[in-house]
Amino acid sequence: MRIICLLLAVTLVFSCKKNDQPGPNYNSDKSRLTQLTDSLMNVYNNSVEGNKPGDYSVGARGSLKAALDLAAQVESGKFTQEEVNNAYSNLALAGQQFSTKLIQEVSAQYLVGHWKFNGNAADSSGHGHNGALKTGYVGSSAATATDGGTLPQLTADRFGRANMAYSFGNGSLIQVPYASELNSPSFTISLWVDMTSNSNGSYMISMNRWWGYKFNLNGTAVPFLTVATAATIYDRDAGAVNVAAGVWTHLAASYTDGTMKFYVNGELKKTWTNTPGAAVTLASPVDLSIGNEMPKEFYNMTDNSNPAYFWGASYFVGSMDDIRMYNKVLTDAEVNSIYIIEKDL
């Protein structure tokens, strides 16, 4: 009898507690959630997926939209303050994750020259290293040197867009005034080339040839980088790599004290680790040359003991586009990112 009474008492207590509990409080403040939803919806509506700086990675918009849809359900429905707060936190996290999907320019703070060749030779890096179209020498010696009389010509780029790249030949070049940030102890060069024909002197980009640095193709179309240091001059190549004629190819090379690297279409092809010393700073500034070894006015045509002596024309024949110059060594991943960003529209 005592057990039955105890059970009845417990039942009554729990029954009373259950009946006394208030229902969920749906009188919640959704103002913060609404503000965040509106803000991120604006971001979503103005975002584009793609592979260029300023785009978002493919699939990123779908993830954000799913989070926005869930938040909208909470805004329009009956939910407690705790549930509203959770929805806010989840949406804020989705917004933060979405921001990490923004494709940014590779090492923008170290990009000291970017010649996109979009109708002109202007530098889009923000550093003002604009190029000028110039003619260059042709001829096999100083005695036979003549002005080629040809300027670089706007041509179609690798996507077939007219006037979005430059073709070079007959000594033509783009001349960029000397600047110390283009003459860095460590650097990376990135560019696209479509070689028409090749020779030992296919200079793609150069600052004072052997006495500064030069990036060219050798006689078998192997990428070749020459860098002068205080102690010596290093000539290194990309190894068993031959650039094909008539095909747009992405090339990159980097140099720092002790290491030189070569890349083709975003892939590391060769690493040299026997190049100690920083790249030299030129004692007498020489302008940067794209498409030829050196601008005409910097040659010495009479004294073959002079480092600036003209030994014969060395210039690129073909088209180039999207040339980048960094005053640091990019990582392998960064070079590959440039290739990914630039290989498609």
Name the predicted role of every residue range:
Residues 19-78:
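Amphipathic, heptad-repeat alpha-helical segments
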Residues 66, 103-107, 320-345:
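Extended recognition patches within non-cytosolic domains
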Residues 116-149, 337:
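Short, tryptophan-glycine- and acidic/Ser/Thr-enriched carbohydrate-recognition patches
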Residues 135-183:
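Low-complexity, glycine/proline/serine-rich flexible segments
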Residues 178, 184, 189, 193-195, ...:
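Glycan-recognition/cleft segments
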Residues 189-191, 247-255, 262:
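Short tryptophan-centered beta-strand motifs in secreted/extracellular beta-sheet-rich domains
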Residues 226-250:
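Short, aromatic/His-centered strand-loop micro-motif at the edge of beta-sheets
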Residues 274-317:
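Flexible glycan-contacting loops in extracellular carbohydrate-active proteins
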